[in-house]
Amino acid sequence: MKPTRVPKNPCFSSGPCAKHPGYSVEELKDTPFGRSHRSKPGKEKLAEAIKRTRDMLGLPDDYFVGIVPASDTGAFEMCLWSMLGCRGVDVLVWESFSKGWATDITKQLKLKDTRVFEAEYGKLPDLKKVDFKNDVVFVWNGTTSGVKVPNADWIPDDREGVTLCDATSAIFAMDIPYHKLDVITFSWQKVLGGEGAHGMLILSPRAVQRLESYTPAWPLPKIFRLTKGGKLNKDIFAGSTINTPSMLANEDWLATLKWAESVGGLKQLIRRTNENLAVFEAFVAKNNWIHFLAETKEIRSSTSVCFKVDLSDEKLKELIKTLEKEKVAYDIGSYRDAPSGLRIWCGATVEKEDLECLCEWIEWAYNLVK
């Protein structure tokens, strides 16, 4: 029978993700429109975004946090280009974004001493094979495969290389031991549902030491430069961005952080995300025609949750179009490079009740098109 209730918010995209519950553009009214980002009010707003981010995440005091251009991609690329090349590199690949980092390292930077450990969608490479005398590049959560690393136990505290982690669809949703990571990057538009185009970069003391002791053989464009006179440019991490940010997007980020504080902070964001995943775990358990793409529970993402459905590609497209036409779910098809299926965002800005409602619609649409 066709469901009668619909999700309050039909936005289940894996990026940009749903705005937080109760979101209103009224929350942006204190944006310093028309003011320079270098002005006192501009700098104060950017510094506030950095401080609230640091406090929310509970980062170590000696880690640096900065706002950088070009989303998570910009944040991660600037570290690949600024820090790699002085020792071997191990890259872990199990979905399209991690594959992109491997391509940049091998085809663009052309680093010869690179080992790529690759697994197919739904699986993880063998983490035991990683050599931490090398620099290690990986994503915490594979946004396009719904597969995450189970923990950070495989990363030694006494590593020689630096660990570079793209954590964009994991941070604010999963328990991440920061001391295991030297570079952490993410974007505003993922777990907290901010706006696009801005990245955030977190550096450990070991990452800073690398930046200050190593100069790459290749030229670096202005928006990749993190040092000045051989020292870390600390201004970047105090709100003096490399280039002009959107003060409107920054205000939106502040609004997301204030919402996150209002629901109880990081622990509650993680709890909300896990409860959202549990909705689908129950749904998959009672329906034999839908399956998680991730092969085991311990590597199953709680944010970008990916599914295989026992339908032909054409029928699956019909199911997705039907749900969009009914205005109950937008942007839930799998990523273009991934196996055909569904990808549904379960981060903290999505309400559990909306996912429960969506499950009813998916079941109805499946029976309609099969």
From Swiss-Prot:
Pathway: Amino-acid biosynthesis; L-serine biosynthesis; L-serine from 3-phospho-D-glycerate: step 2/3; Cofactor biosynthesis; pyridoxine 5'-phosphate biosynthesis; pyridoxine 5'-phosphate from D-erythrose 4-phosphate: step 3/5
Catalytic activity, as annotated: O-phospho-L-serine + 2-oxoglutarate = 3-phosphooxypyruvate + L-glutamate; 4-(phosphooxy)-L-threonine + 2-oxoglutarate = (R)-3-hydroxy-2-oxo-4-phosphooxybutanoate + L-glutamate
Alphabetized SUPFAM superfamilies for the sequence: PLP-dependent transferases
UniProt keyword list: Amino-acid biosynthesis, Aminotransferase, Cytoplasm, Pyridoxal phosphate, Pyridoxine biosynthesis, Serine biosynthesis, Transferase
N6-(pyridoxal phosphate)lysine sites (modified residues): K190
Main location: cytoplasm
Needed cofactors: pyridoxal 5'-phosphate
GO CC annotation, single: cytoplasm
MF GO annotations: O-phospho-L-serine:2-oxoglutarate aminotransferase activity; pyridoxal phosphate binding
GO biological process, one term: pyridoxine biosynthetic process
UniProt: pyridoxal 5'-phosphate binding residues: W101, T143, D166, Q189, N243, T244
Location in or out of the cell: Cytoplasm
Cofactor binding note: Binds 1 pyridoxal phosphate per subunit.
SS bond partners: none
Keyword Amino-acid biosynthesis: yes
Annotated L-glutamate binding sites: R38
Record EC number: 2.6.1.52
Biological function: Catalyzes the reversible conversion of 3-phosphohydroxypyruvate to phosphoserine and of 3-hydroxy-2-oxo-4-phosphonooxybutanoate to phosphohydroxythreonine.
Oligomer and partners: Homodimer.
Family per similarity comment: Belongs to the class-V pyridoxal-phosphate-dependent aminotransferase family. SerC subfamily.
Name of the protein in its database record: Phosphoserine aminotransferase
